[in-house]
Design a protein with these regions (language model features):
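A short beta-strand-turn-helix
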Residues: 32-54
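Residue-level recognition of short loop/turn positions
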Residues: 37-38, 121, 162
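Thiol-/selenol-based redox modules, centered on thioredoxin-like
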Residues: 141-190
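Residue-level structural signal for beta-strand termini and adjacent loop
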Residues: 46-47, 130, 171
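N-proximal helix/coil linker or "cap" segments that precede and/or mark the start of modular domains
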Residues: 5-35
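Structural microenvironment flanking redox-active thiols in thiol-disulfide oxidoreductases
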Residues: 69-127
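Short active-site neighborhood of thiol/selenol oxidoreductases, capturing the structured segment around
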Residues: 46-75
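Structural micro-motif
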Residues: 111-114, 130-138, 149-157
């Protein structure tokens, strides 16, 4: 009986830590991905972006879903404030690049101001310690189109030019996530 309890406890510990998001002070995994800005695909490199300053890397479940639409819109309308604080922003989801081309140009969401990157197999999200769930049969977006891909957790990482995570923000509403992220980025310069 004790052996069974020990085994269950060990498995639970592995399961919990397997999806523990990176914390402040940890090295942020570098990544390169296809991304889109204002409907145009390009090759994104976190290492190159960090040469210009702090980078907000925010993971979201899927383009054109309720919470993600709100979050993208809020990042987009606050982009000048992020830039003034010395930060750029990149959204990351398991959406394919064609879908992100539409999302990045959509005037209601990214509005051409917010770059979004494609992580089709979830490997970038997993490298940040995030849980990636499989596709849900029949799941549709706010446009009524089938989503057809998996989902990463909604978590935001603020990565400083030295490649370290300054703060991890998760477990809050999409709008609150953006507000907290902006406040944290602005606080880095004080």
């Amino acid at each position: 009986m004790n052996k069974i309890l020990y085994t269950l406890a060990a498995l639970l510990a592995v399961a919990v830590t397997a999806h523990a998001a990176l914390e402040a002070g940890e090295a942020a995994p570098q990544f390169e991905a296809r991304a889109s800005l204002d409907g145009k695909a390009f090759d994104y490199s976190l290492a190159e972006a960090l040469e210009d300053g702090t980078v907000v890397v925010y993971f979201y479940p899927s383009a054109y879903t309720q919470g993600c639409n709100i979050q993208a819109h809020e990042f987009s309308v606050n982009m000048d404030a992020f830039n003034e604080a010395g930060a750029t922003v990149i959204g990351v989801s398991l959406d394919d690049i064609e879908r992100l081309n539409d999302f990045s140009a959509d005037p209601e969401y990214c509005a051409g101001n917010l770059a979004v990157a494609s992580d089709p197999d979830g490997s970038i999200a997993q490298s940040y310690g995030l849980e990636v769930r499989g596709a849900v049969d029949g799941a549709e977006d706010t446009r009524g189109e089938e989503i057809g891909h998996g989902f990463a957790e909604r978590v935001t990482f603020i990565v400083t030019p030295d490649g370290r995570v300054a703060e991890t923000i998760g477990g809050v509403s999409p709008m609150q996530n953006v507000k907290m992220t902006l406040a944290a980025v602005q606080g880095l310069n004080q």
